[in-house]
Structures are given as C-alpha cells and as structure tokens.
C-alpha cells in the first residue's frame, strides 16, 4: 500500500509547476490533498485533467496566518509541502517588499501554524540553490553557508534559516529542499529560459539569452523533483531526518548557451540565439552536489537532461496548438 494512502496533505503553491505535479502524484497515491490558492490561474497544469475535482481548495495567501491555521485544523493535516513563493528574480528585484512578505513572512506563518497544530508529522519547505548565494567552491553542498545578496536569494536564505529555527527551537519535524532550476511542461513563467526558448522557436523567432550565455546552472526535471520530495517526506521519520537540508540535482551542468542550442537541435531549428548580455544580479556559476540525497535517501534521478527536454518540448508543442 502507498505510504500516502489516506494521509491528509496540505500543499502551498499548488498552481505552480512543482505544486501541480506533486498534487497530482499525491492524489494518484491515495492522499487527501488540500491546496492553498491565492490567484485563480486557469491555464495552470493543476486544472488540466480530473485531479482538481479530487482535492480541497482553500482560498487565501501565505501572509494570512488565520487562513493557514484554519486549513490545518479543519482538514486534520499531518503533512505540509510548502512550495509557494514569489519565484521570479526580476520581479523580486523590482518588488523586494512583496517578495520578502511572500517568501519570508509566508514561510514563518506556515511554520508557526504547524508548530501550533498537534497532528503535524512532517513539513517540507522548498528553499532553493539561490539560498547559497555566490560561493567560491563548486558544486555547492549542504554545509555551505547561506549568503544570498539580492532580494530573491536573500528571501530564500532567510526562509531556509527560519525553517532550521523551528526545528532546533521547537522540534518541528521540518526538512528543507534546495533544488537546481526546475523545468518541465506546465511552467507558465515564460521569462524562464526553457519555456521562453521553446515558445520563441515554435513561433519561428530566435531565442534570446539575457546573460552572456556562459552562466552555468543545473536543470532538474519536474518529475524527478516530485519523486525526490515524496521520498524525503516518506523517509523523514524512519531515518530521523528532521532538521536536515537536502540538495536535489541531476548534477549535469550546462551553460545557458549550451542549453538553448540543445533545445534548438531537438526542435530541428536552424535559428541562432540572440545573446543580449543584459543579466544583472545573477550568480555566474551555480550547481549542486546531490551526494547527501544519494547516500541518505538512496535517491537517484530517473531522467537525463535530454529525456527531460524531449518531454518538455512535447508538452509545449501540444499546449500551443490549443
């Protein structure tokens, strides 16, 4: 029987890329899922298919502690996946206060509501590779300091540290995830490099690279991310992992230019990318070691970058036909 059968699970950020895939997988595995939704996003992957009819939706925002407390109590929640965030770096630079409110205040509201709620057994908080800021040594491992410098990075460093506080001070069973750049069909943030490139190529337009093209990142396929989150939550108790942070990555690094050229090749396109060289406040080289997850969780990703990109291109090709 699935670990998740009849578990009462609360998911924030369920209209986002990761949240929508995670919710669907939890429902498939028999969980009773309740999602916190601020804005109605009808094009979200969450609303594709029948899963939406099998979950509860609580309307509200992370900034409203009373809404979160009510949801945890009324739906007798035992597991929380806190995925919601203002996740766009450019938006964060333009609107730091609203980003801090969503990402920092929102996180402590979730954790505080969980602290007061007696049924909570496990909380997973989505941090980010950006929480590390810029480090001299690569790849980043979980023992490196959290030292974001710009609004989005700092918001993730803070949320990450606050999560540790709730474990060390109150014994809250919380784990933190730090992933590379997530991608996959259903990401509607078209200022992100993969969906933007695919959209432009489908329209016959040259893809644009905001940076100089040499920035190195690791790209992590969404279905691998879902399995990583579920595995961590499942093993938290038996492996005594509360208070731990885990990097998840397929540990394949690409420059932005290499990534775009890979997509062009897979789409049989002769278009040439336009390198704009406008990237500001971005870390030049950033990628993660997932050795801890491999050792302690016996985790391995299922998808190569090529397999993930092929599935992603297929999704957007169908999406833009509608």
Curated annotation (Swiss-Prot):
Residues reported to bind NAD(+): 8-36
Residues holding substrate: 128
Pfam families: GDP_Man_Dehyd
Cofactor(s), names only, from the UniProt record: NAD(+)
Cross-referenced SUPFAM superfamilies: NAD(P)-binding Rossmann-fold domains (SSF51735)
Keywords, in A-Z order: Carbohydrate metabolism, NAD
Catalytic residue list: 152 (proton acceptor)
Record flagged with keyword Transcription: no
Organism domain of life: Bacteria
Transmembrane segments: none
UniProt key word NAD: yes
Family affiliation: Belongs to the NAD(P)-dependent epimerase/dehydratase family.
UniProt protein name: Putative sugar dehydratase/epimerase YfnG
Organism: Bacillus subtilis (strain 168)
Gene for this chain: yfnG
């Amino acid at each position: 029987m699935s670990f998740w059968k009849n578990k009462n699970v609360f998911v924030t950020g369920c209209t986002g890329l990761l949240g929508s895939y995670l919710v669907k997988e939890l429902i498939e595995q028999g969980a009773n899922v309740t999602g916190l939704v601020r804005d109605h996003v009808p094009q979200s992957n969450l609303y594709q298919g029948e899963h939406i009819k099998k979950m509860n939706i609580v309307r509200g925002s992370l900034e409203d502690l009373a809404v979160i407390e009510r949801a945890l109590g009324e739906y007798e929640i035992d597991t929380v996946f806190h995925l919601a965030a203002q996740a766009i770096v450019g938006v964060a630079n333009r609107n730091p206060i609203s980003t801090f409110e969503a990402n920092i205040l929102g996180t402590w509201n979730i954790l505080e509501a969980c602290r007061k709620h007696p049924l909570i057994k496990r909380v997973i908080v989505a941090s980010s590779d950006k929480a590390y800021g810029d480090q001299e040594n690569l790849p980043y491992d979980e023992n490196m300091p959290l030292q974001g410098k710009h609004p989005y990075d700092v918001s993730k460093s803070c949320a990450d540290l606050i999560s540790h506080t709730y474990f060390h001070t109150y014994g809250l069973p919380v784990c933190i995830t730090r992933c590379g750049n997530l991608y996959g069909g259903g990401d509607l943030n078209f200022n992100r490099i993969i969906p933007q490139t695919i959209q432009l190529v489908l329209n016959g337009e040259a893809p644009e690279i905001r940076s100089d093209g040499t920035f190195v990142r690791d790209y992590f396929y969404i279905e691998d991310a879902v399995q990583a989150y579920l595995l961590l939550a499942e093993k938290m108790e038996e492996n005594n992992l509360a208070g731990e942070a885990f990097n998840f990555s397929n540990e394949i690094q690409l420059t932005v230019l290499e990534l775009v050229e890979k997509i062009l090749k897979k789409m049989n396109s002769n278009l040439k990318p336009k390198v704009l060289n406008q990237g500001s406040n971005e870390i030049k080289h950033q990628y993660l070691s997932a050795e801890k997850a491999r050792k302690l969780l016996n985790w391995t990703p299922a998808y190569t970058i090529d397999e993930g990109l092929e599935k992603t291109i297929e999704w957007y090709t169908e999406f833009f036909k509608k």
